[in-house]
A protein has these predicted regions:
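Short hydrophobic beta-strand element within catalytic cores of glycosyltransferases
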Residues: 342-345, 355
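Nucleotide-activated donor-binding/catalytic signature segment of Leloir-type glycosyltransferases, i.e.
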Residues: 285-308
Length: 429
């Protein structure tokens, strides 16, 4: 019988490009939960800041030359993309990175979103043979030739080419070369895939690149429910300068202009709703929101990183909207639920697993677009009692199924199973 390492003996290194955005928040939350559990976890990152223990900023190549060179490469690659479709991400970066650059070899390497920091070619090639590599999928970039979400493109299931995310797609375009590179790098890795939803895991299994994966798991993100908590609505609104009697819809995403996040459909729905009730759109995020014609109030709060301030934002809302065309999970929806706010979203991706329709929120029909979103929001307006019950049920669901301790337990059990054979002969138990 094989036994893995005990929690306190596990040495795990996490890698994530930045600590902001859904991926950064989820990665840092996992690391903190593992540390509380006793796992020797260390997280490495390139952008952002944190005062959490065992979190290390990569300070290599921080000179002005490397910053300017990085910006130039990003802008050049950006010009190759089709902005209406979504971003295209390259696996190579401007300088090499190797596992030994970050300290002693751990028992497990856990990758998150690492583009524009870790050069995959040099980094994956530096990992010792047999060392378990867990790749936590926050999107589908690791399993495609460059896109974050294939949407209706099926090329990743065979071999990427003619990529719709590129301005000039062709048979042997960037996606074809990227797919070849990943196929070569994944071959021979002790690779284990963890999807943040069953939907994400199912999509990963469909990728031709994932024939190299040794196992597939689904572990949804978790939250510290003592930090993300319900705030008295009247107090939250007073703190944010929101009128107490208005119907408040919340919306949050890192880039408000990202077409995938659905701001245009949300605004179209709210214009129609403004004829029914006095309302406010409360917005968190950076970037430019599409023009609003003044039929309803818009309050932009900018970017908020503090969970306690985020709790104030979510608690001030009557309903939180996630009008994305696709979401692998929907971390902002989870955060809103933890604060007792019901969620309205499209029936797409991992959102269908997170939200329980008519219990913790409502799911609109993506194919119907803005009219369906309008109907669900209108129902929320005219059913205040049911809406409040949904908010309470949402909080209970997060406490029961998405707590940080449960997240750490699931990952620790995975690490233990992967290290069972690795350390059989080294005297550790």
């Amino acid at each position: 019988m094989k036994f893995g390492l005990k929690d306190e003996s596990l040495r795990v290194r996490h890698f994530v490009t930045e600590l902001t955005g859904g991926t950064g928040v989820a990665s840092l939350g996992l690391h903190k939960a593992l540390v509380r559990r006793g796992v020797e976890s260390r997280l490495h990152y390139r952008f952002g800041s944190s005062n959490a223990s065992q979190v290390t900023l990569d300070q290599r190549h921080c000179s002005r030359f490397w910053r300017l060179w990085g910006r130039y490469v990003i802008s050049r690659r950006w010009r190759q993309q089709n902005p209406e479709r979504g971003i295209f991400i390259h696996s190579r970066w401007i300088y090499p990175s190797r596992l030994h650059n970050f300290g002693p070899t751990p028992d497990v390497v856990n990758l998150h979103l690492v583009f524009r920091w870790l050069d995959l070619s040099s980094f994956l090639s530096s990992i010792p043979e047999g060392l378990p590599v867990v790749w936590s999928l926050h999107d589908l970039h690791p399993v495609t030739g460059g896109c974050i979400h294939p949407i209706d493109c099926q090329h990743f299931t065979v071999h990427c080419h003619d990529c719709p995310n590129l301005k000039r797609p062709r048979k042997r375009d960037c996606s074809w070369h990227e797919f070849n590179l990943k196929d070569r790098l994944y071959r021979g890795l002790n690779l284990h895939i963890v999807g943040n939803s069953e939907w994400t895991t199912a999509q990963a299994r469909r990728s031709a690149l994932m024939r190299h994966a040794r196992s597939f798991q689904t572990i949804p993100p978790g939250l510290d429910t003592e930090q993300f908590t319900c705030v008295e609505k009247s107090c939250a609104r007073q703190a944010l300068g929101v009128a107490s009697k208005k119907f408040v819809v919340g919306f949050c995403c890192p880039d408000l202009s990202d077409p995938n996040k659905g701001a245009l459909m949300l605004l179209e729905s709210l214009r129609a709703l403004a004829a029914e009730i006095e309302m406010t759109l409360l917005v968190v995020g950076s970037g430019k929101l599409p023009a609003v014609d003044g039929k309803f109030e818009v309050i932009k709060l900018g970017t908020i990183h503090s969970p306690r301030l985020q709790s104030v934002f979510y608690s001030a809302c009557d309903v939180f909207a996630v009008p994305s065309r696709i979401e692998s999970f929907g971390l902002t929806a989870l955060e809103a639920m933890a604060c007792g706010t019901p969620v309205v979203a499209f029936r797409t991706g991992g959102l269908t697993e997170l939200l329980v329709h008519e219990e913790t929120g409502l799911l609109a029909d993506l194919a119907a677009g803005a009219p369906s979103l309008f109907e669900t929001l209108s129902w929320m307006i005219h059913h205040p009692s049911e809406r409040q019950n949904m908010g309470r049920a949402a909080r209970l669901r997060v406490e029961r199924e998405f707590g940080a301790s449960l997240l750490a337990q699931r990952y620790a059990e995975l690490y233990q199973s992967l290290t069972a054979s690795t350390h059989l002969g080294d005297g550790r138990s």
